[in-house]
Design a protein with these regions (language model features):
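Noncatalytic, beta-rich nucleic-acid-contacting surfaces in large DNA/RNA-processing enzymes
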Residues: 1-285
Length: 285
């Protein structure tokens, strides 16, 4: 896999092969992932390398891995530490969207915290005009507790204290994570394959649509008309990919698009060895 960094098709093929042989592919995660893919024999798992992520490079990947033993009490603490590395805003946002920092919270929570970190000039702001935050009573109150106040602005900001309180407040909001479809789209955009796999038995029948193709009849009175839909799927629970066929009339009752998720209720294998979907429903998670 390391030899194919940057080749999305080859990497996707290798990942599919590994999954079919029951070798788990673990997504990039802070404290665990190195720049390159590596195989953990004890866990029988391959950890994705962070340098395989678009716009990431080996230098930044190694800097992140070097931080694996850092004692960090919050995401804000991490953001301050990251200022000493070469990571840029685009790279950081991509990692957040991919769940790389999930130990600190879900992607939507962390993006909100990061946006405010950026608003306060990467935690270094000395002043802020009241007019910029007067429409946010919570933020206005937090800043007022950690700064001096004049008629038009707050100055002598204790940014770290402000951002710590902001993070604590955001965690009370119970902000929902990205939808599964958004996570899948992010996986595809930034890594070229889907690493969103839960490992849960109950999620095995939940199938991500990777590809679909209309099957057209070429004989008889129905020539030129579609009779079925050939689909390639990936199990959300196991990561295993499969090829199946859906009857066109059934498809018309509940259509789906690429990266949608369907719940497979019933299927069979016909006498030609093809898997036929008998019943399914499109789900939103």
């Amino acid at each position: 896999m390391n030899a194919w960094n940057g080749d999305d098709d080859k990497t996707a093929e290798a990942i599919t092969y590994a999954q079919r042989n029951k070798i788990r592919i673990k997504p990039p995660r802070f404290r665990h992932s190195k720049a390159e893919y590596y195989f953990d024999a004890e866990e029988r798992a391959i950890y994705r390398g962070t340098s395989s992520i678009k716009f990431l490079n080996e230098g930044v990947s190694n800097e992140l891995y070097d931080m694996r033993d850092e004692e960090l009490n919050s995401f804000v603490d991490l953001l301050y530490k990251l200022k000493d590395t070469g990571i840029n805003a685009r790279q950081l946002e991509i990692l957040i969207k991919l769940g790389y920092f999930e130990e600190f919270g879900n992607a939507c929570e962390l993006l909100k915290i990061y946006n405010l970190f950026d608003f306060f000039k990467n935690g270094e702001a000395k002043t802020v005009a009241k007019s910029k935050i007067e429409n946010d009573n919570i933020l206005f109150g937090i800043v007022s507790r950690h700064a001096n106040e004049t008629t038009k602005q707050f100055n002598k900001l204790d940014c770290h204290a402000i951002l710590d309180e902001i993070e604590s407040y955001i965690r009370t909001l119970q902000i929902k994570d990205l939808s599964m479809k958004d996570k899948i789209a992010n996986d595809m955009e930034y890594t070229g394959s889907i690493s969103t796999i839960t490992g849960k038995e109950e999620d095995r029948p939940k199938l991500i649509i990777l590809d679909k193709r209309m099957l057209i009849s070429n004989r008889g009175k129905d020539a030129g008309k579609p009779w079925g839909v050939a689909i390639t799927t990936q199990s959300l629970g196991s990561g295993i990919q499969s090829s199946m066929t859906v009857d066109y009339k059934q498809y018309c009752k509940e259509k789906f698009d690429i990266h949608d998720i369907i719940y497979l209720k019933k299927f069979h294998k016909n006498n030609r060895g093809y898997f036929i979907v008998d019943n399914y429903e499109r789900i939103f998670i």
